[in-house]
Amino acid sequence: MHNLTIAEISRKLQAKEFSSEEITRYFLDRIKQQDPTYNCYVTVTEELAMAQAKAADARLAAGNAPTMCGVPFAHKDIFCTNGVKTTCGSKMLDNFVPPYNATVVENYINEGAVMLGKTNMDEFAMGSSNETSYFGPVKNPWDTNCVPGGSSGGSAAAVAARMAPGATATDTGGSIRQPAALCGITGIKPTYGRVSRWGMIAFASSLDQAGVMARSAEDAAIMLNVMAGYDNKDSTCIDEPVPDYIANLGDSLAGVTIGVPKEYFEVGLNPGTEARVQDAIKQYETAGAKIKSISLPHSHLAVPAYYVIAPAECSANLSRFDGVRYGHRCDDPKDLMDLYKRSRGEGFGEEVKRRILVGTYCLSAGYYDAYYGKSQQVRRLIKQDFVDAFKEVDVIMGPTAPSPAFAFGSKGDDPVAMYLEDIYTIATNLAGLPGMSVPCGLVDNKPVGLQLIGNFFAESKLLNLAHQFQLATDFHTLAPSSLA
C-alpha cells in the first residue's frame, strides 16, 4: 500500500476499496517501523490522525467528498498546528504549541485530509542539508550516509521512503526543489503570493513560499489545488483566480518553447547531473517541444544577493524570539539584557546565529545602502532577466542542484560551499517565479532533478510539462533499493 500515489489512494477511498482509517493506520505503522532509520518526523500525531480518518470516512460514506478527503499526508514543522507542537527544527521552539492553525493547515483540514505528523527540517528553514536541525539530521533513503537536502529534508525523505504519499514544504531559496531533487521526488514552489504564508513561521518574508512534495506531478497538482488561493490574513497573498491544476495535465507539448540558460551549464555542475538533465531536455524535444538557448546574464549574482537579503530579513523576523513571550527562556537571568542574550544564545543553533549576525551587519548604519540596498537593485536585474526570457520562451529548464546528494559533514566547515547548493534555485525566489523539480535519472544510484521555471502564475503549465515527462519516463516511480 505504501507505493500508492495520492491519486490512487483517493480513487480507492472513493470506490470503498479500503477506508481512511485502514490506510492511515498502515502509514502510522510504517512510520514506527521506518522512521528510526531516517528521522523524518519530529512529531507523529497518531491519535489526531485516526480521529481525522474516522471523520473522513463519514464524509466519504455520505458521498461527494473532496479529492484529498481521507488521504494521509505530512506537514513540514514550520506550519502552526493548533494544539500540536510546532518547532521549526529549533531548540528555541522545542515546546511551542500554537493556539491556531496556519491557513495552509486549515485548508487541508477543510478538505478532510489526514495529518500523519510534522516533518523534520533545517532550523528555521536555514540550510541545504537538514544538518542544522535541533532534532538531528534526516537521512537520505537512497543513501543513509548522505543528506536529503534542505531545508524541507524531512518532507522529502518521508515521501521518498514511502512514509507519506505527499507532504507540505516551504521554499525560500530552493528548500522544496533541492531536497526533491536529492530524494528523487517531485516538488513545486508556486509563485510568490499564490499560497498563504499566514501561520507559516517566517525566515525571509519576501522570499518564503509554501508548496508541496509528492511522488508525481499529478499528486502535486492535487495537493496544490487544496493549498492555493487568496487569504486576507496574508497581505502578500495575491487575489488571483486559482485554476484546476488537474484539469490541464493533458495538454500537448506541441508548440511549447523551452529555454535552456547557458549560465546553468557552466563551471561547478557535476558531469553526470548535466548528462541526465540534457537527456531529459532532449526527451521534451522528441515529444514536440522546441528548445532554445537563452541567457540569464545576472545569474552569477543571485547567490551573493540572496545571502544579503535573506539574512537581513531573518535578522528582523527572528528578533521576536527574545525569551519573553514564547520560545526558549534561559534559567535564572540576572536582568533583562541577560535574559535576551542567554535565551537567544541557547535557543538558536550555529547557522541561525551566523545568518542573524550577517543580516544585522548588513542592516546597520553605514552599511545598509552598500549591502541591502545594492542587493535589492541586483534582485531587480535578476527579475528583469526572467521577464526578458519569457518574451521568447514558455518555460525555462536546467538542473535543480549542482550534484546528487553529498555525504554528511562534507560541507559543514565551508558555509559558502553549502550556500552554492542553491545556485540554480535562488534566482527563482528572488524573482518570485514558480519553480519545480522532477526526477530525471540516477548518477551513482542517487537521484538527479530537472528544474522547470515558469512565468508568474504558470503553475498549471509546469505541472502539465512535468506530467507529460512522467507519462513518458519512469524516473518518478523509482524507489530506494533499501526500502522495505
Curated annotation (Swiss-Prot):
SUPFAM superfamilies per the UniProt record, alphabetical: Amidase signature (AS) enzymes (SSF75304)
Record field: catalytic activity: L-glutamyl-tRNA(Gln) + L-glutamine + ATP + H2O = L-glutaminyl-tRNA(Gln) + L-glutamate + ADP + phosphate + H(+)
Coiled coil stretches, renumbered: none
This protein's UniProt keywords: ATP-binding, Ligase, Nucleotide-binding, Protein biosynthesis
EC number: 6.3.5.7
GO CC terms of this entry: glutamyl-tRNA(Gln) amidotransferase complex
Database matches in PROSITE patterns: AMIDASES (PS00571)
Biological processes per GO annotation: translation
Catalytic site positions: K76, S151, S175
Recorded superkingdom: Bacteria
Main EC class the enzyme belongs to: ligase
Annotated disulfide bonds: none
InterPro entries given in the database record: Amidase (IPR000120), Amidase_CS (IPR020556), Amidase_dom (IPR023631), AS_sf (IPR036928), GatA (IPR004412)
GO MF term (any one): ATP binding
Similarity annotation: Belongs to the amidase family. GatA subfamily.
Subunit structure: Heterotrimer of A, B and C subunits.
PANTHER family: GLUTAMYL-TRNA(GLN) AMIDOTRANSFERASE SUBUNIT A (PTHR11895:SF151), TRANSAMIDASE (PTHR11895)
Its job: Allows the formation of correctly charged Gln-tRNA(Gln) through the transamidation of misacylated Glu-tRNA(Gln) in organisms which lack glutaminyl-tRNA synthetase. The reaction takes place in the presence of glutamine and ATP through an activated gamma-phospho-Glu-tRNA(Gln).
Protein name per UniProt: Glutamyl-tRNA(Gln) amidotransferase subunit A
Protein species of origin: Teredinibacter turnerae (strain ATCC 39867 / T7901)
Protein's gene: gatA
